[in-house]
Amino acid sequence: MSSPALIPFEIALPQATLDDLATRLARTRFAPDLANDDWEYGFNGGYLRALTDYWARDFDWRATERAMNAWSHYRLDWHGQPIHLIHQRGKGPAPMPLLLHHGWPWTFW
């Protein structure tokens, strides 16, 4: 049985994707909050507004992309399941292999 091919890649969202996100954030319409400061009746509208504002004005995707791309990213297909991994060689005379994984599909970082 052969090993699956490791395909190197860099994270690079198209600018059109980021432009689309900026447009959607700018067009966000918020429902009335109904004084839900304690989150007792669901999501807090003030928090959602602040979060949306942060994503629209302050979050720098390209800086995050550069930070993520400081690592060596690879993809592979394992029995039809796409896998994203980072391979970082250990240092020192006897490095120990370590596998870190997450349980939510398609998430990273």
Where are the predicted features?
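Residues at structural and domain junctions
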Residues: 7-8, 34-37, 97, 101
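Extracellular structured ligand-interaction cores
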Residues: 6-8, 71-73, 82, 95-96
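Short boundary motifs at domain starts and secondary-structure transition points
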Residues: 1, 89-91
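A short beta-loop-alpha structural element at the N-terminal edge
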Residues: 11-15
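Non-catalytic accessory segments flanking enzyme active sites
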Residues: 17-87
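Short, contiguous pre-domain boundary segments
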Residues: 1-8, 28-34
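Conserved HGGG/HGGXW glycine-rich cap/lid loop of the alpha/beta-hydrolase fold
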Residues: 91-109
